[in-house]
Amino acid sequence: MAASHSLGEKILIKLIRFYQIVISPLIGPRCRFVPTCSCYGLEAIKTHGAVRGAWLTLKRILKCHPLNAGGYDPVPPKSDNHSKENKK
């Protein structure tokens, strides 16, 4: 069963898919991370919603530069937000 997404989530997902289909093939692979930043963005938005997902994606994109080695950097699980708050 497909999850229903808010309008904001749908717009962000379509923008990322546009990038993946149209822009990324033109510029070639450049991401230093696994999953790629665009795949990370899709997963973050689907998992955390439009606002938090966009924030996580922006932070990830800002880390993707030549001075960062990259590597495996998965989207944090949704329950991670609550566990950090409970530990305070």
Curated annotation (Swiss-Prot):
Membrane topology annotation: Peripheral membrane protein
Positions of region (Disordered): 67-88
Pfam families: YidD (PF01809)
Subcellular location: Cell inner membrane
Name of this chain's protein: Putative membrane protein insertion efficiency factor
Entry's family note: Belongs to the UPF0161 family.
Broad class of where this protein is predominantly found: membrane
GO cellular component: plasma membrane
Organism expressing this protein natively: Actinobacillus succinogenes (strain ATCC 55618 / DSM 22257 / CCUG 43843 / 130Z)
Residue ranges with Basic and acidic residues bias: 79-88
Stored InterPro entries: Membr_insert_effic_factor_YidD
Disulfide bonds: none
Lineage of origin: Bacteria, Pseudomonadati, Pseudomonadota, Gammaproteobacteria, Pasteurellales
NCBIfam families cross-referenced by the UniProt entry: membrane protein insertion efficiency factor YidD
Keyword annotations: Cell inner membrane, Cell membrane, Membrane
